[in-house]
Amino acid sequence: MPQPMSPPAIFLMGPTASGKTDLAVELVRRLPCEIISVDSALVYRGMDIGTAKPGPEILAEAPHRLIDILDPAEAYSAARFREDALAAMAEIAAAGRVPLLVGGTMLYFRALEFGLDRLPEADPEVRAQIEAEAAASGWEAIHARLAAVDPPSAARIHPNDPQRLQRALEVYLLTGRPLSAFHGGADASTLPYRLLRLALIPADRAALRERIARRFDQMLELGLIHEVETLYRREDLNPSLPAIRAVGYRQAWAYLAGEMDFETMRSKAIIATGQLAKRQLTWLRSYPGIEVLEMEQLDPAAVVARVRAHLEAARAGAGP
């Protein structure tokens, strides 16, 4: 729980392609902030183009913590992110700077602020039962079953994501509690920081979809297929790994495997990215205490002023 003289921290949240990085860099230029990435794909090395990872020039000006920390063969979790982010926040605050947490992995934000209950270990029998049902009825039927018992998890997990669907339903079958109840079930912050929660949200969904399509085409021009081909050649990687299941990567992988042609791959990747943005916005709408920044009318100078006021209030020990 934050105390009157708790150090300040900033959350900058938003869907994919909403302009979070540009705004974060502007804040770093103007204020004593240091960026911590809140993104489940940016943690992976060798996955730069398809994740829209900031380039060397941006990173030189505004270093990001928690990017390029894992090999794509490794898995990352909300629990590990929370541990890593708390350590980074403490280091930044101890240096007299302000943690600026930027990203679109909303589960990570919730885990960081509200904590995580201990999840049950995997159960081979339950997993086999779910896999048998999926083999008989399809993963869409598993998704529908999950939606009946855990609507929030079903809203954020795509029907074509068997790994996460299986885990979410497994947790419910083992505990009688939905997975979403473990992910920060309370809305009382556990962080010892005075938080300002900013959310970039589009007023026009169609405009965001257009930005997503343009950005994916830019990724293709920059060499996304070659980047994924480098991963595809590795014998230790496969499409069931979390890194390869990232939006854009799984479609490019399927294209390289001969499962679809180029235009189908492009179309599916753009649609999947739009679906990701929709899920991110669903999470944002239910996130407590956010201040909405309208994406199309964004005034960076006004955001800098708002953050500066938050930092001054924190130093003075004034109210939130």
From Swiss-Prot:
It catalyses: adenosine(37) in tRNA + dimethylallyl diphosphate = N(6)-dimethylallyladenosine(37) in tRNA + diphosphate. Its cofactor is Mg(2+). The keyword ATP-binding applies. One of its GO terms (molecular function) is ATP binding. Substrate binds at T16, A17, S18, G19, K20, T21. Keywords: ATP-binding, Magnesium, Nucleotide-binding, Transferase, tRNA processing. The record marks T105, R127 as: Interaction with substrate tRNA. Its EC number is 2.5.1.75. It is an enzyme of class 2 (transferase). It comes from the Bacteria. Residues 39-42, 163-167 are annotated as: Interaction with substrate tRNA. One of its GO terms (biological process) is tRNA modification. Pfam families: IPPT (PF01715). ATP binds at G14, P15, T16, A17, S18, G19, K20, T21. InterPro entries: Dimethylallyltransferase, IPT, P-loop_NTPase. Catalyzes the transfer of a dimethylallyl group onto the adenine at position 37 in tRNAs that read codons beginning with uridine, leading to the formation of N6-(dimethylallyl)adenosine (i(6)A). Belongs to the IPP transferase family. Monomer. This is tRNA dimethylallyltransferase. The gene is miaA.
